[in-house]
C-alpha cells in the first residue's frame, strides 16, 4: 500500500489520536469527569485544527468522493465479522461518512487564513466531532462490540476495506489522498489501542452504568442510605440486566482498587479516608455480586467456570460468550421505565419526595446516550407518576418541578417528528393530568385554603404546560362537560364546607343556635375575604373563586336563617329576654355584613326580611304600641288630680311614653339593609306614635275641658276616645274638691298642661335618636326617598314688555314641558301698559323640571302672530319644601321680563314629617289649653273689675245733642274709690294664691305664654275702658274724669307690679311692650270735645 502522499506525516497521527480521544468521552460519571470531558473536547478541536492548517500549508487539493463510494461502505459494513447490525443502521449512519470524510478532508482543505482562524467556531467541526461520537457510541457498536478493543479492531478492518475500495474506484489525486489517509489510519490503529485505558477494562452498554445511578440516587440523600440501597440491590434488577450488573460491580471494584474510580484519592482529606472508601466500595461490590448470583444461579456457575478455567481467566471473553444476558437496544425503553419507577419508589419510601432532580438526571442521560426520543421519555415519566396520583400518594400541586423539567426537554423538539404512538400516548396523559388537575383543584378550593400556594401550583401547570401544549387534544364538548362537572363538584364542596360549619356550631337548641349561626356567618365572611385576597384573578377566565363561594354558601346561609329565627319572629318582643334580642340583633348584623361584603343579590333580601324585618320589626312595633294604648286611659284617670302633682308628669308620663321609648330602643337594636328600609321602619313607627300621642293628649285635653266646665266645641278628638269615663272623672274631681272656686279647679289642672309640654320635650328627645347616619348611608337611595311627589301650581301673572305705548298688539304665553306632552296656551291679552294674564296651571312632578315659555305677539288689526321671545322656568320641588311657594321674574331673551308664581303641594312622608306634625299638634293643644286658662282668668279678673265699679266708667250719651250728663258727686266717688280698693285687695289675694301654684307647678314655657297672653288681654281691657272702639255707631262715649282715670291706672299699676314678680322666668320683657306704653300714653292725650260732653271738674 505504498503511495505518494503530499500531506504531512503527522496529519494522520493527529487524526487517529482525535478518534481515540473521542472514545474516552464515553465514560462520564460525575461533574468532575464532565469538566475533564470539556477539556478533552477542546484538545481534540485543537488537534484537528492543527491538521487542517498543515493541509493548507501543503496545498492538499479538495476531494470529491463519488456516491458509489458510500454505497460500497454501506454494503460492506454489515459483512463485518463481529457485526450484527440492524437494517435500519445503514440509513441512519450514512451521515457519518458524508460529514467525517467529505466535509473534513475535502471541504476545508483549501481554506484561506481568515477561514482557518474562524474554523474553530465553525459548525462543521462540531458536526464532524459529533458524528464520530455518534458512530463510536451508537447502540450497535456499544452492544455488539462490547469492548473498546473490538471497536478498535473493527475500525481497523473498516479503514482497510475503505482504503482498498478507494484505490480501486478513485483516480488521480483524490485516490492518492483518500487511500493514503485510510491506510495510515488503519496501520497506526494498534499503537493507539495500547494507549487507550478503556481497552483494558470492561465498558458496559455504551456509557450506561447501573452503579452510576446507584451512586446518583444515594448522593441525593446521604451515605448510610447507600448501604441500604446496595443491600437491597435485588429490587433494582430488571429482567435483562443481571449480567450487566455483575460486570459493572466488578468494574467498580477494579477501579476503586486501582485508584481509577469516580472518586480519586485527591478527592479525600487523607489517605486513610480514601482507603476506607476503597474498602467499603470493594465490600459492597462483592456483597452485591453475591446477591445477584444468589438470584441467578446459572450466571454464578458460568462465572465460576470461566474464572477458574485453565488458561482462560479473561472476563471479557466470558461476557462475549454470555451475550444473552446483555441488554438489547430495543429493550432500552422498558429498562428506562423500570429504573425510573424503582428510583421514584425509593425516593418516596425514604423521604416522601418525588426525586425530581434524580429522575431529571437519569432521563437526560437516556436521551443523550441511548438516543431515546424526548417525547418517549416524557411519556414514561408521566406514566410513572400516574398511579401515585390515583392512589393519592402525591398531590398534583407537587408536580410543578416535574412538568417544568421534563417539558423543557420537548420545548425545542419538533412535534412533526414524533411517532404516532408517542403522540397518542402523550395526548392521553395530558388529558388524564388535566382531569386530575381539575379534581385536585376542586379538593383544594373546596377546603377553603388559607394560602393559595397549592392552587396556584395547579393553575401554573395547567396554564404553562397542559393548555399550551399542541398535543393537548380535547374536543370543546369534552371540555364543556368537564368544566360543568368541575363547577358542580366545587359547589358541592362548598356546600359540604357549610354543612361542616353547621355541625360544628349548631346544637339544636334555639337559643344557642342563634349565636352558632352568627359564628357560621363570621367564618363564611372571613373565608370569603381570604379567598378574595388569595384569588383576586379569575380562574380559567370565567371563575372568581370568592364570588362562587359566596353564591354557594350565602344561599345556604339565607335558607337556614328563617329556620333558626322562626322561634322568635312570631313572639312578642316583650316576652323575649334582652339577651335573646341582643343575639337576634347580632345575628342580623352579621347577616347584613356577610351580604354586604359578598355583594350578594338584593333579590335574596326577602329571605332576611322573612327572618327579621318583614315580620319581626313591624309586628313587635305594633305590639308595643297596642300594649301601651291599653294602659294610657287607666294611667290618665288614675294619676290625674292627685295631691302630688309633680309625680304625674314625671313618673306617669314616663310610664305612658315608655312604649315609644321601647320602640326606639327596639329599632336601635336592629341594623338596616338599606336607607329605604330604615325610612320604612321609622315611617311605620311615626304613624303608630302619631295615633298613640293623639290618643294620650286628647284624653288629657278632654279631661281638662270637662273639669273646667268649658264646652268642647267640635274639637278633633280621636274617634275611640272614652268621653263618658273622662266626664265622670272630671265630675268626681269637682265634687270632691271642696271648693267651688274655679281657680282651685284650674290650678289642679296645671299638671295636664305640664304633661302636654313634657310630651313635646320627650318627643324631641326620642326623635333625636333616629339614626340619621343609617338614613344617609346610601346617599342616592336616601335622596331618591326624599324627592317628593308634588303638585306644582304655576301662575302666569304679568309681564314687562318693551313695546311702544298704544301698540296694536295682544300677547299670549305658551307653557310646555319638552320631556312630556304637557303644553298649555294662555288667552290673548291686550293692555296698553302691562299685559296681565293671571292664569294658573297644575301638574304632578317628582324631580326637577325645566319648562319652556314662548311669548307670542299678535297684531290686533291684521291678526298676524309672531314670537316675541323665550324664557326658561326651572322647578325643583325639593327646594320648595321650606317656603312652599315663591314668585320669580324671568328674563325674556333680553326683551323684558315675565312674572311667574310657583306654589307646591308636597306629598312627603319621612320620619321628620311625622315628628314635626306631632310637635305642631302638641304645641297647638298646649296653646289651646293655655288659652282656655287665660280666657277664664281674664273673665275672673274682669268680674273683679266689674265688681269694683270700674266697668261703670264706660258711659254713653243719650241720643239727643243736649249735654244732660250729670257730674258724679264727691260722695259717690269716695264710695267707688273705697269699693275699688277693697276689690283690689281681694283680687290680689286670690291672684297671689293662684299664681303661686302657677309659679310652682307650671313649666316655664307655658307659664311665660300664659302671663304674656294674659297681660296682653288686660291691656286690651283697659284700652277698651279708656278709649272707645272706632265704629260707625251714633253712640258717643262720655270721657273719664281725672279721678276715674286715676282709679283705672291704679288697677293697671296693680297688675303691672304683680306680674313684675314673674319677670325673672321670662326669656324677655313681656311687660314693657309697645301695647303697654300706648295704654300708658292715653292719660297724657286724654280729652273729649266740649260740644259733646260737659267737662267734669276734679
Swiss-Prot record:
Q: Which PROSITE patterns match?
A: MHD1 (PS51258), MHD2 (PS51259)
Q: Name one GO biological process term.
A: negative regulation of induction of conjugation with cellular fusion
Q: Which residues form the signal peptide?
A: none
Q: Which residues form a coiled coil?
A: none
Q: Which UniProt keywords apply?
A: Cytoplasm, Cytoskeleton, Nucleus, Transducer
Which residue range or ranges hold the MHD1 domain? Answer: 567-700
Q: Which SUPFAM superfamilies match?
A: C2 domain (Calcium/lipid-binding domain, CaLB)
Subunit description:
Interacts with cyr1.
In Swiss-Prot or TrEMBL terms, this protein is called: Adenylate cyclase activation protein git1
- Which source organism? Schizosaccharomyces pombe (strain 972 / ATCC 24843)
Q: Source taxonomy lineage?
A: Eukaryota, Fungi, Dikarya, Ascomycota, Taphrinomycotina
Q: Which gene encodes it?
A: git1
Amino acid at each position: 500500500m505504498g503511495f505518494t502522499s503530499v500531506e504531512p506525516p503527522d496529519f494522520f497521527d493527529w487524526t487517529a489520536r482525535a478518534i481515540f480521544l473521542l472514545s474516552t468521552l464515553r465514560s462520564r460519571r460525575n461533574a468532575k469527569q464532565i469538566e475533564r470531558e470539556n477539556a478533552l473536547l477542546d484538545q481534540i478541536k485543537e488537534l484537528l485544527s492543527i491538521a487542517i492548517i498543515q493541509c493548507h500549508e501543503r496545498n492538499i487539493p479538495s476531494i470529491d468522493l463519488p456516491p458509489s463510494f458510500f454505497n460500497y461502505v454501506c454494503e460492506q459494513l454489515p459483512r463485518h465479522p463481529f457485526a450484527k447490525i440492524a437494517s435500519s443502521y445503514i440509513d441512519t449512519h450514512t451521515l457519518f461518512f458524508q460529514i467525517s470524510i467529505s466535509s473534513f478532508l475535502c471541504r476545508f482543505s483549501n481554506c484561506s487564513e481568515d477561514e482557518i482562524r474562524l474554523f474553530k467556531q465553525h459548525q462543521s467541526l462540531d458536526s464532524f466531532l459529533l458524528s464520530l461520537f455518534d458512530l463510536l457510541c451508537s447502540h450497535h457498536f456499544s452492544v455488539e462490540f462490547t469492548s473498546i478493543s473490538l471497536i478498535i479492531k473493527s475500525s481497523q478492518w473498516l479503514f482497510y476495506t475503505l482504503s482498498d475500495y478507494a484505490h480501486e474506484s478513485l483516480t488521480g489525486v483524490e485516490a492518492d489522498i483518500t487511500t493514503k489517509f485510510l491506510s495510515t489510519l488503519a496501520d497506526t490503529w494498534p499503537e493507539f489501542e495500547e494507549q487507550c485505558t478503556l481497552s483494558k477494562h470492561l465498558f458496559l452498554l455504551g456509557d450506561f452504568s447501573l452503579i452510576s445511578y446507584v451512586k446518583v440516587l444515594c448522593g441525593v440523600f446521604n451515605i448510610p442510605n447507600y448501604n441500604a440501597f446496595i443491600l437491597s440491590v435485588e429490587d433494582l434488577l430488571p429482567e435483562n440486566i443481571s449480567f450487566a450488573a455483575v460486570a459493572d460491580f466488578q468494574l467498580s471494584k477494579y477501579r476503586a482498587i486501582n485508584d481509577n474510580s469516580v472518586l480519586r484519592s485527591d478527592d479525600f482529606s487523607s489517605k486513610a479516608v480514601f482507603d476506607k472508601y476503597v474498602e467499603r466500595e470493594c465490600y459492597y461490590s462483592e456483597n452485591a455480586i453475591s446477591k445477584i448470583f444468589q438470584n441467578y444461579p446459572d450466571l454464578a456457575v458460568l462465572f465460576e467456570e470461566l474464572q477458574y478455567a485453565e488458561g482462560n481467566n479473561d472476563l471479557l471473553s466470558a461476557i462475549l460468550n454470555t451475550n444473552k444476558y446483555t441488554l438489547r437496544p430495543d429493550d432500552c425503553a422498558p429498562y428506562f421505565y423500570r429504573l425510573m419507577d424503582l428510583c421514584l419508589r425509593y425516593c418516596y419510601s425514604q423521604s416522601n419526595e418525588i426525586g425530581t432532580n434524580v429522575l431529571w438526571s437519569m432521563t437526560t442521560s437516556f436521551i443523550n446516550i441511548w438516543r431515546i426520543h424526548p417525547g418517549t421519555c416524557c411519556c414514561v415519566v408521566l406514566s410513572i407518576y400516574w398511579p401515585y396520583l390515583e392512589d393519592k400518594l402525591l398531590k398534583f400541586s407537587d408536580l410543578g418541578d416535574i412538568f417544568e423539567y421534563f417539558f423543557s426537554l420537548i420545548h425545542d423538539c419538533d412535534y412533526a417528528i414524533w411517532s404516532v404512538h408517542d403522540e397518542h400516548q402523550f395526548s392521553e396523559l395530558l388529558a388524564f393530568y388535566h382531569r386530575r388537575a381539575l379534581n385536585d383543584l376542586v379538593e383544594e378550593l373546596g377546603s377553603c385554603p388559607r394560602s393559595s400556594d397549592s392552587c396556584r401550583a395547579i393553575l401554573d401547570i395547567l396554564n404553562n404546560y397542559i393548555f399550551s401544549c399542541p398535543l393537548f387534544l380535547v374536543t370543546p364538548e369534552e371540555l364543556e362537560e368537564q368544566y360543568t362537572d368541575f363547577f358542580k363538584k366545587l359547589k358541592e364542596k362548598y356546600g359540604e364546607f357549610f354543612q361542616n360549619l353547621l355541625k360544628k356550631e349548631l346544637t339544636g337548641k334555639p337559643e344557642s343556635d342563634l349565636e352558632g349561626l352568627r359564628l357560621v356567618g363570621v367564618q363564611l365572611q372571613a373565608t370569603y375575604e381570604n379567598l378574595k385576597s388569595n384569588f383576586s384573578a379569575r380562574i380559567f377566565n370565567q371563575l372568581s373563586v370568592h364570588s362562587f363561594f359566596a353564591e354557594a354558601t350565602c344561599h345556604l346561609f339565607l335558607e337556614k336563617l328563617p329556620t333558626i329565627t322562626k322561634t322568635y319572629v312570631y313572639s312578642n318582643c316583650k316576652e323575649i329576654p334582652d339577651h335573646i334580642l341582643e343575639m337576634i340583633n347580632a345575628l342580623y348584623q352579621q347577616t347584613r355584613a356577610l351580604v354586604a361584603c359578598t355583594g350578594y343579590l338584593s333579590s335574596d333580601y326577602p329571605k332576611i326580611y322573612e327572618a327579621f324585618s318583614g315580620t319581626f320589626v313591624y309586628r313587635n312595633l305594633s305590639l308595643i304600641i297596642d300594649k301601651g294604648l291599653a294602659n294610657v286611659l287607666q294611667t290618665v284617670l288614675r294619676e290625674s288630680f292627685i295631691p302630688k302633682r309633680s309625680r304625674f308628669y314625671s313618673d306617669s308620663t314616663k310610664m305612658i311614653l315608655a312604649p315609644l321609648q321601647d320602640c326606639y330602643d327596639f329599632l336601635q337594636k336592629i341594623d338596616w339593609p338599606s336607607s329605604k328600609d330604615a325610612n320604612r321602619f321609622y315611617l311605620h313607627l311615626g304613624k303608630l306614635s302619631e295615633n298613640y300621642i293623639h290618643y294620650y293628649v286628647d284624653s288629657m285635653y278632654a279631661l281638662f275641658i270637662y273639669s273646667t266646665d268649658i264646652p268642647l266645641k267640635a274639637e278633633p278628638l280621636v274617634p275611640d276616645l272614652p268621653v263618658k269615663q273622662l266626664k265622670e272623672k272630671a265630675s268626681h274631681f269637682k265634687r270632691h274638691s271642696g271648693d267651688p272656686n274655679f281657680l282651685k279647679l284650674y290650678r289642679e289642672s296645671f299638671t295636664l298642661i305640664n304633661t302636654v309640654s313634657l310630651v313635646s320635650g320627650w318627643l324631641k328627645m326620642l326623635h333625636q335618636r333616629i339614626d340619621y347616619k343609617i338614613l344617609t348611608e346610601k346617599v342616592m337611595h336616601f335622596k331618591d326617598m326624599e324627592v317628593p311627589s308634588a303638585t306644582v301650581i304655576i301662575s302666569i301673572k304679568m309681564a314687562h314688555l318693551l313695546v311702544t305705548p298704544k301698540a296694536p298688539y295682544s300677547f299670549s304665553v305658551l307653557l310646555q314641558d319638552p320631556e312630556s306632552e304637557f303644553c298649555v296656551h294662555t288667552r290673548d291679552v291686550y293692555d296698553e301698559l302691562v299685559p296681565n294674564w293671571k292664569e294658573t296651571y297644575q301638574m304632578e312632578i317628582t324631580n326637577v323640571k325645566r319648562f319652556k315659555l314662548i311669548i307670542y305677539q299678535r297684531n290686533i288689526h291684521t291678526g298676524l302672530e309672531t314670537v316675541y321671545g323665550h324664557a326658561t322656568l326651572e322647578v325643583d320641588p325639593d327646594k320648595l319644601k321650606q317656603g312652599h311657594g315663591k314668585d320669580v321674574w324671568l328674563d325674556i331673551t333680553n326683551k323684558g321680563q315675565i312674572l311667574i308664581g310657583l306654589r307646591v303641594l308636597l306629598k312627603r312622608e319621612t320620619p321628620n314629617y311625622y315628628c314635626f306634625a306631632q310637635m305642631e299638634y302638641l304645641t297647638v293643644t298646649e296653646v289651646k289649653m293655655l288659652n282656655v286658662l287665660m280666657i277664664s282668668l281674664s273673665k275672673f279678673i274682669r268680674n273683679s273689675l266689674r265688681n269694683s265699679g270700674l266697668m261703670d266708667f264706660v258711659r254713653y250719651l243719650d241720643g239727643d245733642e243736649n249735654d244732660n250728663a250729670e257730674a258724679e258727686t264727691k260722695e259717690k266717688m269716695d264710695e267707688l274709690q273705697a269699693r275699688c280698693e277693697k276689690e283690689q285687695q281681694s283680687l290680689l289675694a286670690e291672684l297671689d294664691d293662684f299664681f303661686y301654684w302657677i309659679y310652682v307647678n307650671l313649666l316655664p314655657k307655658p307659664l311665660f305664654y300664659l302671663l304674656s297672653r294674659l297681660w296682653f288681654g288686660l291691656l286690651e281691657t283697659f284700652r277698651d275702658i279708656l278709649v272707645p272702639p272706632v265704629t260707625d255707631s251714633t253712640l258717643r262715649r262720655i270721657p273719664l274724669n281725672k279721678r276715674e282715670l286715676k282709679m283705672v291706672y291704679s288697677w293697671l299699676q296693680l297688675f303691672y307690679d304683680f306680674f313684675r314678680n314673674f319677670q325673672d322666668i321670662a326669656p324677655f320683657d313681656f311687660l314693657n311692650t309697645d301695647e303697654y306704653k300706648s295704654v300708658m300714653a292715653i292719660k297724657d292725650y286724654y280729652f273729649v270735645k266740649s260740644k259733646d260732653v260737659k267737662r267734669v271738674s276734679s
